């Protein structure tokens, strides 16, 4: 499986579309705001949108922290579509959305598409980097550390590339570049594949 990053043109088009969708976001109730989040992130907690993370089962603390950073324009070194989405969210909105997504069911492992060789390499890399120390032994996340298990593969790969390239700031930016140092794109792809297809041992 090859993961590709969208072109500048497609990213720009996505930002315009999101901007139009959320132009009156500040005027909506918390329930309506949550419904608009579902447009990209999935109503059942599982995203079916490319490069867009699933939020079901994410720790509330993590969701609130990320929305806070987006609202302040401090989530990345370049503007993101989420900056515009979050700019009119109040603190009560952040807490409500955090609680909502934490209660949603986490995404399930994909039913197909797993590559045994990539899974083995990814597992070895993840265990050698002690990812479980911060993200929990089952990669379910805790506090400000996100859930990694069964996250979208394309999103995991992009996030790791951004951390490795120091393009992502905020929580994690102090430790993740060091944790990913020395890993090539193929290594990151194997890690993303393993985590996306992770199954908790019985």
Predicted regions, residues:
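C-terminal capping alpha-helices of c-type cytochrome domains
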Residues: 87-109, 154, 180-202
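Short, tandemly repeated low-complexity microdomains enriched for cysteine and small residues
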Residues: 77-85, 110-116, 172-179
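Bacterial N-terminal signal peptides
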Residues: 15-24
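Gly/Gly-Pro-rich "capping" loops immediately C-terminal to redox-active cysteine motifs
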Residues: 45-74, 83-88, 123, 127, ...
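N-terminal secretory signal peptides that target proteins for export/translocation
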Residues: 1-12
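Residue-level hotspots at or immediately adjacent to binding/recognition sites across diverse folds
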Residues: 43, 81-82, 137, 172-176, ...
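Sequence/structural segment immediately N-terminal to covalent heme-attachment motifs in c-type
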Residues: 28-44, 109-110, 114-137, 152
């Amino acid at each position: 499986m090859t993961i590709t990053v969208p072109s500048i043109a497609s990213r720009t088009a996505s930002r315009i579309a999101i901007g139009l969708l959320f132009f009156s976001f500040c005027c909506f109730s918390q329930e309506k705001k949550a419904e608009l989040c579902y447009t990209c992130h999935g109503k059942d907690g599982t995203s079916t949108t490319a490069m867009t993370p699933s939020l079901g089962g994410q720790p509330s603390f993590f969701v609130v922290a990320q929305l806070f950073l987006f609202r302040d324009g401090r989530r990345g070194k370049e503007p993101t579509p989420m900056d515009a989405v979050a700019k009119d969210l109040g603190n009560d909105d952040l807490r409500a959305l955090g609680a909502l997504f934490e209660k949603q069911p986490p995404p399930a492992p994909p039913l197909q598409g797993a590559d045994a060789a990539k899974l083995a390499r990814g597992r070895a890399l993840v265990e050698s980097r002690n990812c479980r120390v911060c993200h929990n032994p089952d990669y379910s996340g805790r506090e400000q550390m996100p859930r990694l298990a069964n996250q979208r593969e394309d999103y995991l790969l992009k996030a790791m590339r951004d951390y490795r390239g120091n393009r992502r700031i905020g929580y994690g930016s102090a430790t993740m570049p060091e944790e990913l140092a020395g890993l090539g794109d193929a290594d990151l792809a194997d890690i993303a594949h393993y985590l996306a297809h992770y199954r908790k041992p019985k």
